[in-house]
Amino acid sequence: MSSRILDDIAEEARKGSFGTGEDQESVIRGIELLKRQKLNVAFVGATGVGKSSTINSIFNMDVAKVGDRTDPETASIQKYEIDNMVLWDTPGLGDNPEKDRQYAVEIAGLLKRKDEKGDLLIDEVVVLVDGSNRDMKTAYETIEHVVAPYIEDPKRIIIAINQCDVALKGRFWNNDRCEPEAQLAAFLDQKVTSVRERIAGSTGIATSPMYYSALHHYNISKLLLAMIIAVPEKKRFLFTDSLNRNPDVWKKNDELETYNQKIQQEVKGSLSKALEGAAAGAAAGASIGRFIPVIGPVAGAIAGAALGFLGGLLG
């Protein structure tokens, strides 16, 4: 499946929008190389933690293609493809010890799988933690025994605490403002610290847990930024075609950082890096930066149509 945005940019390059000769060919070659890339993300967590709702919040599942389950080694894992994105929704853990053992073997098999180049297939793992549950045993066992042993770079592990709105049984969640009040925010900050320290103590891995609410679309941009930064820089642009087109999803985040602007910067930098690394046309990166209006100040007609949904991130 091809990237629609990259197809549009390649078409503009063929028209000479980014120069002619070697610069033009460099952009086209770089785009063609990027179009052959796949970005694989696995979602892991306990039953009821909200893997499906999280995936639906971040990604445009209306156009997702459902993969088959013919591989007996990963029969319980659901695969979705959205252009160059491949999402792996693993079965929930913690309900049945016998099934947990089966699922753990399947998840481990997925995390150990190699692509045609011999590299690990999965680019990152998003481990979801239930913010409403004080019993974190399943979450910690999943991280320690199922995920951590098979991820070479711990920076590729995202710890995301979902259901932050009900972490105190719904108390101190402001429904009108769709955000936690001070008491709940303080409790969630403590949970983040506790989870980080527990993971470090049991695995030796340094993580940066964050909390969000898939139901209320709170801190979805924060989660997306963490996911983008965790993958190789040249692949970060591949998120763009797959994202949820509903601008309301991206509006409400905490104010610790300007997540939406940073997302745009990462997308711009990723495409520039991919093109610069492809051939001698190093100036293509800056040209593409101007070409994409939502990650730069200048609007272009085709780019605006292709990437307009990201404009909601600026809101």
Report the location of each language-model feature:
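Membrane-active amphipathic alpha-helices enriched in small hydrophobic residues
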Residues: 263-315
